[in-house]
Amino acid sequence: MSVSAFNRRWAAVILEALTRHGVRHICIAPGSRSTPLTLAAAENSAFIHHTHFDERGLGHLALGLAKVSKQPVAVIVTSGTAVANLYPALIEAGLTGEKLILLTADRPPELIDCGANQAIRQPGMFASHPTHSISLPRPTQDISARWLVSTIDHALGTLHAGGVHINCPFAEPLYGEMDDTGLSWQQRLGDWWQDDKPWLREAPRLESEKQRDWFFWRQKRGVVVAGRMSAEEGKKVALWAQTLGWPLIGDVLSQTGQPLPCADLWLGNAKATSELQQAQIVVQLGSSLTGKRLLQWQASCEPEEYWIVDDIEGRLDPAHHRGRRLIANIADWLELHPAEKRQPWCIEIPRLAEQAMQAVIARRDAFGEAQLAHRISDYLPEQGQLFVGNSLVVRLIDALSQLPAGYPVYSNRGASGIDGLLSTAAGVQRASGKPTLAIVGDLSALYDLNALALLRQVSAPLVLIVVNNNGGQIFSLLPTPKSERERFYLMPQNVHFEHAAAMFELKYHRPQNWQELETALADAWRTPTTTVIEMVVNDTDGAQTLQQLLAQVSHL
């Protein structure tokens, strides 16, 4: 009997089972213990293969692929700390709903806790973060292929969002020629190999039903809060709110067109919050709200009913309102709850939104990050998409810009970490094939610098704007101790990215004004390559501009 041959047959069943659940993209890191999984994936023509040498970046690449494809994406890594590097991407997927399938190779049980090399306790290492965790046994013909495939099917068939961890121990030898070992074991699955359906099919999840009193609530004074959603959902939500005559507070990730722009500015005005107090119902569609003033208002508002609609399960309301948690696809929910044409009830807020935008426009000429955030809608590629980093940049875009309705916007706003942002952007571009504008800060770029290797392989133009404000200037907005702020919070690195771009043979520009930036962008959109544009700005200008605008708008 050939151990290596049966390892590969066992792995082939696992990989084939994944294809029955929509897995097309598979991300592979180098490793020896994962050889059976890697070779099985390589031999399966249903997969699009992606590789990367850094498992943390690989997990985020898969996250980006899953964001766009809306399908589960598989990841293969070897044993040891390689597995632990997948933790950040798994956590993010659990909070934002992408489906990741982590296939982690492992040493067999007799090599654990005895000093064997690269052998750690992998079963259960991700605690409660996966939706399902499976610790497979060592491959053996004593366990039927039916058990193996139905175990995989059960986990994936009930997966609605988040990750599945499948731990796969393999004994040596891992290499060798294929022979007939395990062929009859594999063939007991019969014509399943020629089929395209799962061996075990789970019943679909039940979603929230139509709210029978909707006809009553839609006649009341309501507010729509739009969080993270798809581009198509964003357009539908905007029309729905407009028909109802309800004010729409749109997050940067809502893709609604933000008909009342600069919400995180005007929500700091007492006239706005006073008018919003008249709302009898708030309907929040989508989660992961960004703006600080929006979150403060959301926490303090007291409508008669607060409804949250999202297809991600869980509470999704840190303010714990009295109301309804409705688990449903947003577009489907809107169809079940049609709008009735009514006149807008808010008078003051549209005026404040217009005045706030005019205040922002009055400051747009200076070459800085706040101004870039406002101008970003002018720089979006046609038929393209935007990927926004975390910390200060996403808050500035949320507060100061007005993105087009239905224009795809992606970000990692679940756990809101700055790790893996470039890798996620690479996955977003690969899955869509669209021109992509990605914007991150300098520390975020440094954190995921080796992901520039992934950006060498793009199918359409990708522009990475690195806003270099020399450190974590988000902390300039917080009451951090002034004497310790630079050393322990901002951590300026005093670096530039020209040589990093050169190391990975990427185009690079460092514009000094808007004309140079626009020229660099126009050139970048002409060729299907990656261009790094480093925008060096004064350290605290972005944070100070936001604070000044907040003060100005609060007194309108």
Curated annotation (Swiss-Prot):
Keywords from the named record: Magnesium, Manganese, Menaquinone biosynthesis, Metal-binding, Thiamine pyrophosphate, Transferase
Enzymatic reactions: isochorismate + 2-oxoglutarate + H(+) = 5-enolpyruvoyl-6-hydroxy-2-succinyl-cyclohex-3-ene-1-carboxylate + CO2
Listed GO biological process terms: menaquinone biosynthetic process
Superkingdom, taxonomy of origin: Bacteria
Pathway(s) annotated for this protein in UniProt: Quinol/quinone metabolism; 1,4-dihydroxy-2-naphthoate biosynthesis; 1,4-dihydroxy-2-naphthoate from chorismate: step 2/7; Quinol/quinone metabolism; menaquinone biosynthesis
Keyword Mitochondrion tagged: no
Class of enzymatic activity (EC top level): transferase
Annotated transmembrane regions: none
Record family assignment: Belongs to the TPP enzyme family. MenD subfamily.
Assembly with partners or alone: Homodimer.
Role description: Catalyzes the thiamine diphosphate-dependent decarboxylation of 2-oxoglutarate and the subsequent addition of the resulting succinic semialdehyde-thiamine pyrophosphate anion to isochorismate to yield 2-succinyl-5-enolpyruvyl-6-hydroxy-3-cyclohexene-1-carboxylate (SEPHCHC).
Protein name: 2-succinyl-5-enolpyruvyl-6-hydroxy-3-cyclohexene-1-carboxylate synthase
Species this protein is from: Escherichia fergusonii (strain ATCC 35469 / DSM 13698 / CCUG 18766 / IAM 14443 / JCM 21226 / LMG 7866 / NBRC 102419 / NCTC 12128 / CDC 0568-73)
Name of the gene encoding the protein in the UniProt record: menD
